[in-house]
Amino acid sequence: MDTISIRKFLYGIGAVEDLQGEVLIVNGKPIVSELDKNRNPVWTETWDRKLIFLVSAPVQNWKKIKIDRPVANRKEFEAIVFEYAQKEGLDVENGFPFRVKLIVKEIQAHIAYLRPETAQNFSPHGKKADDFPIDLENEPVRIIGFAGKTAGGRFAMPAMPGREASSLHMHFISLDFSRSGHVEDLKIEAIWQLCYRIKTSELLLTRKSYLGKNAI
């Protein structure tokens, strides 16, 4: 990750090498979420990590949209993100970044972790059992995400037996930057703010794959 040369205004999400953690970049500031040897979560501000993949984009200015609609789950959230992205004329096929400011009713998240034996016989069930769960309630957070109808296998979960490809990948960050993780599901009851990149030029959406396997 330390090879990234353009960091100013950069937003990105990705996974640490061998699925040993998550990475989030917020306005040029990296937060790495990992587990220590005792499976306790550790959050570090550093560029010194090897990654499996990273999707990123420089965003200097955001358009803020007030959303007064409750969200019961990830599916409803995703529908709203795409609805407003289309209204803004964004590239909903190839992908776009978004940012959310909110007080969540609930968030289910995780920090990626993969045991060697799980990696040898990889399955979604095995990975989920290895991941470190994070649950939040009634807490103000920020969410950085990337969405696109062709995101599955590019920068979101690919299609697997019994599960469709995902169109959205997002991480949360606490207001004090002390905690972060990959968002699995969420519930929103209060008014929230959805932000999109203001189109001043063509979007430079970068997706880097560093390894061939377990890329998401």
Where do the model's predicted regions map?
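N-terminal low-complexity or amphipathic/hydrophobic leaders
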Residues: 1-56
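Extracellular structured ligand-interaction cores
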Residues: 20, 95, 165-169
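Short, glycine-/Ser/Thr-/acidic-enriched flexible segments
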Residues: 30, 105, 148, 177, ...
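Contiguous hydrophobic, core-forming segments of folded domains
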Residues: 35-96
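Exposed beta-sheet edge/beta-hairpin loop segments within beta-rich domains
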Residues: 154-164
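C-terminal structured interaction module
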Residues: 164-166, 171-216
